């Protein structure tokens, strides 16, 4: 798909949603998203509510160490009902509707945790590179559950890079790189980067093709972010694996070979815990397709 056509699609989205009354985002924020590929900050909940969720995460880490640990942080919304509530949070979903329309499904979630004074980082990349969708028109809310700034290793994004096609990535499998393959885009002008500084309870939203990264956490506190990766319209299909989704709002998906995930009725609901294993196995097959190496996440 050419650059001009991608820009045309972005323009159509911008014109359509500016003709409607947005539910959460201002018209200026919608314009920023379409021009730069990201928008922030958006208040989702109070600081105290966010910190309470961060404390709850530490609690379930202690109670269920096999279910949530450094190599098992994908799709935690299927194991813990308090994270499922974030997936369906009205402010989050209304903001997604402002950008993508009223029919929404969610592909996966990822809990990004950087421990204090650690070397873990995220290299320059585009999310859509290995996601295996037939279209890259989707968006990821990233909810901050701690203070996210330069010291703690906040995300940095290059404005406007979402309008290009997927560029070449090199798989490094660097042990300190949080990304599955340690994939990296070389020769990025980091001086163009914008730091997405967020307080607890705020979120950013970014496009699947915007180039972004994050540095190590040099502070003495945990940096915690919950990425809802990604919301998309029901007509977007998975081409590398099974079509497994969480229904969020509006029209239901109708994949003949697909699977709609249930919502957990309570923490560690055995039905959705089992579904999480299926979803994570499918996710790994997609993200590591054609790779000779594979990590445990």
Predicted feature residues:
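Non-heme Fe(II)/2-oxoglutarate
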Residues: 63, 210-211, 215-297
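Histidine-centered catalytic micro-motifs
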Residues: 121-129, 205-215, 232
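Active-site region of the double-stranded beta-helix
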Residues: 102, 128-133, 143-154, 160-162
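A short beta-loop-beta micro-motif enriched in histidine and acidic residues
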Residues: 126-138, 191-192, 198, 221-222
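Short, conserved beta-strand element in jelly-roll/cupin
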Residues: 132-150, 197, 228-232
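Fe(II)/2-oxoglutarate
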Residues: 3-35, 273, 288-297
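Double-stranded beta-helix
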Residues: 150-215
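Non-heme Fe(II)-dependent double-stranded beta-helix
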Residues: 21-133, 169-170
């Amino acid at each position: 798909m050419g650059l001009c056509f991608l820009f045309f699609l972005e323009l159509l989205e911008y014109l359509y949603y500016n003709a409607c009354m947005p539910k959460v985002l201002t018209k200026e924020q919608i314009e920023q998203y379409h021009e730069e590929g990201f928008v922030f900050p958006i208040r989702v909940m109070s600081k105290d509510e966010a910190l309470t969720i961060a404390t709850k995460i530490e609690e379930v880490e202690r109670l269920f160490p096999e279910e949530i640990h450094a190599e098992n942080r994908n799709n935690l919304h299927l194991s813990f009902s308090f994270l499922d509530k974030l997936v369906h949070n009205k402010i989050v979903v209304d903001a997604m509707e402002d950008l993508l329309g009223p029919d929404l499904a969610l592909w996966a979630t990822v809990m990004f945790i950087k421990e204090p004074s650690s070397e873990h980082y995220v290299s320059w990349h585009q999310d859509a590179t290995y996601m295996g969708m037939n279209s890259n028109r989707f968006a990821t809310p990233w909810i901050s559950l701690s203070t996210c700034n330069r010291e703690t290793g906040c995300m940095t994004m290059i404005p406007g890079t979402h309008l290009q096609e997927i560029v070449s990535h090199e798989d490094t499998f660097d042990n300190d790189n949080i990304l599955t393959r340690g994939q990296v885009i070389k020769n990025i002008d980091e001086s163009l980067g914008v730091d997405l500084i967020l307080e607890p309870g705020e979120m950013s939203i970014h496009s699947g093709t915007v180039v972004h990264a994050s540095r190590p956490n040099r502070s003495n506190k945990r940096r915690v972010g919950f990425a809802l990766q990604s919301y998309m319209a029901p007509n977007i299909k998975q081409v590398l694996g099974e079509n497994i989704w969480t229904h969020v709002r509006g029209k239901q998906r109708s994949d003949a070979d697909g699977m709609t995930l249930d919502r957990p009725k309570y923490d560690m609901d055995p039905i959705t815990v089992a579904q999480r294993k299926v979803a994570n196995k499918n996710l790994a097959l997609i993200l590591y397709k054609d790779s000779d190496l594979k990590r445990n996440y």
